[in-house]
């Protein structure tokens, strides 16, 4: 008789306004119906999450977790350097959820998300790094990214793309251009994005990019009107290819990129991190197996 897999669900009870906590019985019931008994850890702090993930990687065949992109980042940075890792399953439950699009799992409804997750297939997903920090989908330098993240969902639903205008204009007042050397080439830019993601800041900018080939792309937005804000808006509205063809951005691709800048504070998977430069970034040489509905 085939042994049932060992399964655990780790979640932050406060993320996503407590939506996961409110649906916990349903979530565990559905996971248990498919895999058998499911253990549960209710994390009390980021340190508790890190410790729980690290220990669970040694014990379980499937590690399900819930939160936002920042939670996903903490998970990949907690993974120990061992040969055999569990299959990871991500249930979106935070304020920023670009990874929900990358994996094809609903972010709008917990029960729909559970259905998507439990019908997904294991897929290889690359883990990136910048300096000593791992990331799952993006590292970027800009005054504007946080403005996009904090735009309330209610306003986005009501006003569509116009909802971002107010927050972007507020960021514009404090915006600046950065001096960045990428692979030895000097750029003066209002925004740098290093990613393997289809979606960044809730915008699909590189829909056909593969996340299991060890390849990363860097978008360097060119200077332009309104300190480059028009070029940034074009990138997020029409995507990497269109912005490159219209000469609004430069694009550098590769598994490994060398970067040098005096700017230490970067957005990494939706959270600000202090980094040291010069740094090597790109494919970490490691991938995880994650449940996904994307081909």
What are these regions (language model features)?
Residues 1-66, 73, 186:
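ATP/NTP phosphate-donor binding region
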Residues 21-23, 76-79, 101-103, 205-206:
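Short amphipathic alpha-helical segments
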Residues 43, 81-193:
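Catalytic core of DAGKc-family lipid kinases
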Residues 71-83:
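Short Gly/Thr/Asp-enriched flexible loops that form oxyanion-binding sites at enzyme active sites
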Residues 133-140, 145-146, 187-195, 200-202, ...:
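Short hydrophobic-aromatic micro-motifs
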Residues 155-162, 206-228:
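Gly/Ser/Thr-rich active-site loops/lids in small-molecule metabolic enzymes
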Residues 210, 220-295:
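ATP/nucleoside-binding phosphotransfer catalytic cores, i.e., glycine-rich phosphate-binding loops
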């Amino acid at each position: 008789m085939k042994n049932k897999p060992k399964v655990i669900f780790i979640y932050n009870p406060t993320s996503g306004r407590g939506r996961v906590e409110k649906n916990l019985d349903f979530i565990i019931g559905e996971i248990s119906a498919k895999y058998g008994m499911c253990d549960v850890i209710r994390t009390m702090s980021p340190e508790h999450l890190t410790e729980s993930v690290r220990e669970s990687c040694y014990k379980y065949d499937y590690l399900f977790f819930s939160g936002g992109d920042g939670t996903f980042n903490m998970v990949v940075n907690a993974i120990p350097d061992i040969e055999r890792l569990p299959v990871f399953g991500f249930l979106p439950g935070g304020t920023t959820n670009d990874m929900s699009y990358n994996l094809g799992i609903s972010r709008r409804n917990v029960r729909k998300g559970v259905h998507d997750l439990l019908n997904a297939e294991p897929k290889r997903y690359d883990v990136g790094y910048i300096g000593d920090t791992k990331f799952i989908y993006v590292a970027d330098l800009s005054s504007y990214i946080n403005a996009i993240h904090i735009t309330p969902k209610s306003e986005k639903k009501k006003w569509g793309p116009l909802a971002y205008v107010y927050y972007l204009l507020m960021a514009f007042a404090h915006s600046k251009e950065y001096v960045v050397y990428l692979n030895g080439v000097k750029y003066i830019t209002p925004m740098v994005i290093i990613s393997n993601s289809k979606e960044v800041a809730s915008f699909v900018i590189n829909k056909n990019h593969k996340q299991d080939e060890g390849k990363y792309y860097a978008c360097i937005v060119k200077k332009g009107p309104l300190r480059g804000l028009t070029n940034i808006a074009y990138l997020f509205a029409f995507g990497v290819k269109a912005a490159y063809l219209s000469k609004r951005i430069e694009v550098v691709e590769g598994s490994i990129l060398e970067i040098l800048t005096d700017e230490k504070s970067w957005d990494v998977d939706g959270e600000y991190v202090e980094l040291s430069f010069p740094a090597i970034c790109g494919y970490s040489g490691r991938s995880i197996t994650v449940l996904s509905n994307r081909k």
